[in-house]
Each structure stands twice: as structure tokens, then as C-alpha cells.
């Protein structure tokens, strides 16, 4: 249906699902991707940007002219900056200096202020800096890693959308990368209720296998693998953890672009790789859905899409 919206924020959600045709082999389960880059800010994080700001407005913690500060690996910041611009709020984003140039420039384009922290300190360094600045100036911190509005919006929207999109068809597996854990927690809980036999797979970087009980470490899969177990992550919702190597994520993001015309980011490559492995295991006649969190255009300055 063609929509005429009163605000850009009304266009968040209701993202399409597409089937992979050339990457999956014929003896595997069918693999589907939910294209979260079809949100107006080009990522899944638009959903939580809107949810966290609107929850704070309802609670009286935010009003026009106020300042939001958030530690973010990029896409949450873009979602928050977009929603803040639409609502007349000021946004300051704190992120590790390892994040791509596109992300930084996009934030500035939306009118946000940027504070960069040392990449070696990871998200922990960004969180610490944001908390210091918030305390000093009285800014509002949405705190995506422990804000209940984060998984809740995925219960209310993402999970419900998937059930509506698949209807009475059985969905056999759901694959999502873990950044804050909001998507897998919220959508996963709804999917378990709708499809009791579904298997849910949590994707994390092999080089920072914290959910698997390993040690945090540097990795190249931007947006997932924060190096700690987030407060809002329901660790009971997933059945299996799927570690993905940097090279696997890069290879499958590139292949999806070249062979399917689907241009995702690095964590999208990780989700696609994991979904294809799950599909092989499940076999023909089953259905696997993976979340594609962001658009590959956001990674053109990274090693993901460098050409001679």
C-alpha cells in the first residue's frame, strides 16, 4: 500500500522479506532475508531509535530542545539522529574511532555532534565517555544495551511483521546477529510463541565469542559482538550460538551483492553465511529467515567493498 506519512518516523518498520535464489543450494532449506535496510535511516536501528525516544517523551524525560547522548557503533546513532532531527531534539553520539567514515558523516548530516573514543577500548570506552558527559551536562542517555524499549519494539513490530509475512507457513529457523540483543530477544520471543518448533540462532564474531563463554577480542564485523553480554539479551531465547569469522562475513556480504543483488553490510554477511549453513543442516522443504540489519553503502570506505 502506498503511504503518505506525516513524519519520517511513521515510515519506520514494515520491512519486506526476500528469498535467496542463487546462493542457497537445491538440497538446502529455503533462505529468506528480512531487509531492515529498507527503513528510512537504512538500518534495523531506526526501530529502537524511535522507540527509546518516544518512551522517554511519554515518561517526561525528554522534550523539544533537549539533548540525547548515546554510545553507539553507528547505526543506532543514525536512527537516533534521524528521529531527533524530526522531533527537534539535539543528538550527541559517542563511538569508537574504528567506525566507518560514512557512519560519521551521516551522523553529521543529520545534525548530530560526534565524540570519538579509542578503538582499542571498544564499546566499553564509548559507554564510559557517554556516561561521563551525561552526568556532567544532564543529557538524556537512551542506553540501548539495557533499555527495555529496545526488545519491546521488536516484540511489537519486527516479530509481529514476520508472523504476518509468513502467515500459516511454518518458519523453521531464525538467524540474527547479536549487537544489543534487542532483535533476537524481542522478535525471537514472538516467533517462539507463533512457531513452537522454530530454532533460533545467535550470530557472534569468532574473534569475540563472549556468548559462547570465550574472551572478548577485536574483530571486523561492525555492529555485532560488543565484547560483553548485554543486559537486555534474553539468553534463553536462542537455541544455538553461531560463531562467524571476519572472512566469512565479508565473503558472503560480497556474494549476496554480486549474486543476488542484495547489498548488505558486514553483519548482514555474517547473518547470510550462518543462515546458509543452517539451511544445509535443515535440508529441503524447510524455511530459514535471517535479519539483514544494514545497507552496504554504509561500508564503501571499509575493506568490505574496496576495488583495485
Curated annotation (Swiss-Prot):
Pfam families in the record: PALP
Family under the similarity heading: Belongs to the cysteine synthase/cystathionine beta-synthase family.
Entry EC number(s): 2.5.1.47
Annotated residues for binding of pyridoxal 5'-phosphate: 75, 179-183, 267
Cofactor(s) listed: pyridoxal 5'-phosphate
Effect of deleting the gene: Grows very slowly with sulfate, butanesulfonate or cystine as sole sulfur source.
Biological process according to GO: cysteine biosynthetic process from serine; methionine catabolic process; positive regulation of cell population proliferation; positive regulation of core promoter binding
Protein origin, superkingdom: Bacteria
Assembly mode: Homodimer. Forms CymR(2):CysK(2) or CymR(4):CysK(4) complexes in the absence of O-acetylserine.
N6-(pyridoxal phosphate)lysine sites (modified residues): 45
A GO term from the CC aspect: cytoplasm
Pathway given in the UniProt record: Amino-acid biosynthesis; L-cysteine biosynthesis; L-cysteine from L-serine: step 2/2
Any GO molecular function: L-cysteine desulfhydrase activity
Chemical reaction(s) catalysed: O-acetyl-L-serine + hydrogen sulfide = L-cysteine + acetate
Function: Catalyzes the conversion of O-acetylserine to cysteine. Also acts as a sensor of cysteine availability in the signal transduction pathway modulating CymR activity. When cysteine is present, the pool of O-acetylserine (OAS) is low, which leads to the formation of a CymR-CysK complex and transcriptional repression of the CymR regulon occurs. In the absence of cysteine, the OAS pool is high and the CymR-CysK complex is mostly dissociated, leading to a faster dissociation of CymR from its DNA targets and the lifting of CymR-dependent repression.
UniProt keywords, alphabetically: Amino-acid biosynthesis, Cysteine biosynthesis, Pyridoxal phosphate, Transferase
Upregulating conditions: Highly expressed in the presence of methionine, but poorly expressed in the presence of cystine. Also induced by superoxide. Repressed both by sulfate and cysteine.
Protein name: Cysteine synthase
Cysteine-cysteine disulfides: none
